[in-house]
Swiss-Prot record:
Belongs to the AIR synthase family. CDD domains: PurM (cd02196). This is Phosphoribosylformylglycinamidine cyclo-ligase. Its EC number is 6.3.3.1. Pfam families: AIRS (PF00586), AIRS_C (PF02769). It is found in: Cytoplasm. Its main location: cytoplasm. It catalyses: 2-formamido-N(1)-(5-O-phospho-beta-D-ribosyl)acetamidine + ATP = 5-amino-1-(5-phospho-beta-D-ribosyl)imidazole + ADP + phosphate + H(+). It comes from the Archaea. Pathway: Purine metabolism; IMP biosynthesis via de novo pathway; 5-amino-1-(5-phospho-D-ribosyl)imidazole from N(2)-formyl-N(1)-(5-phospho-D-ribosyl)glycinamide: step 2/2. One of its GO terms (molecular function) is phosphoribosylamine-glycine ligase activity. GO terms for cellular component: cytosol. The gene is purM.
Amino acid sequence: MSEVEGGIINRKLQGEFVNTFIRQLKFHREDFKNIGYIGGFTSIIDMGNFGITFNNDGVGTKAMIAEAVNKYDTLGIDCVAMNVNDAITVGSEPIAMVDYLAVNKMDEEMAKQLGTGFNVGAQMANISIVGGETAVLPDVVKHIDISGAVIGIVQKNQIITGSNIKEGDVIIGLGSSGLHSNGFTTVRKIIADNNLDLQDTFPGDSKKTYEVLLEPTRIYVREILDIMGIITIKGMANITGGGFKNITRMKDMKYVIDDPFEPQNVFIRLMEMGNLNYAQMFEIFNMGTGFVLVIDEDEKVDIMNALKGKVPVKVMGHVENGSGVEIPKYEVSLKGYY
């Protein structure tokens, strides 16, 4: 069984690899325990009346697109977004971040662009970048690897776990800005197979291909924090690697997506050029939905009013007893993580 076939990472093998690693992590201190579980969007360290959230992520092979056109100024936004959007899923307010850059050469212009992007992302998420590490590893790194880690804070009585999600609850979707920072192994394979130059105009778009692919990941922190005091949020999911399967990480229920966002042009064109089906697309990409919330049915009007004009938002579906994700419009049925 191949790890990558047709530009698609084998999620089963990836999951087995990760689980094997996690099973070795047997030591835990008796104090400052992890309230959550290893493998969630973020971990929560018990600090008494409050918890500190801690998680890390990176931009993956999206950085290779940036490297190919020497345009790095949005990667920092992506890195911040990938981390803070995970942190807020439990109701945490991200407060600080450290970054890690692994490069094969020292390029001052690249450093300037990367730093600019991180600074913009920090402003958007209202966090401080308090440190980091830059490693020049020409013998190890062929391209560039960008990642970071974020800490946040949440009162213990306000932690959002998804445990009280029930049948009849409403699924709210927040629109994505495009590809965000996932699925780029598949994207790069499709682009190469179709001999599409990054400087070419992207099919069905007025922008160049690299501009479409490098559109920065949307950051949802301010919008989520604004509504937490007025809406009872039962669960949240960041739609990243694994696509819509991430929704099931909130709780093992059936999530029926009756009215998804229309996928942006980039997804439709990639699906056509890559000869992929909708099931594959929804398991790899965000398909227009970057973040999902679950609330009581009687609060849907309030949340729509609260978020109107701030971020694309819509009532996408409902929760049923069962398991997995159903998207009837596209005849897609995805198994959950459980």
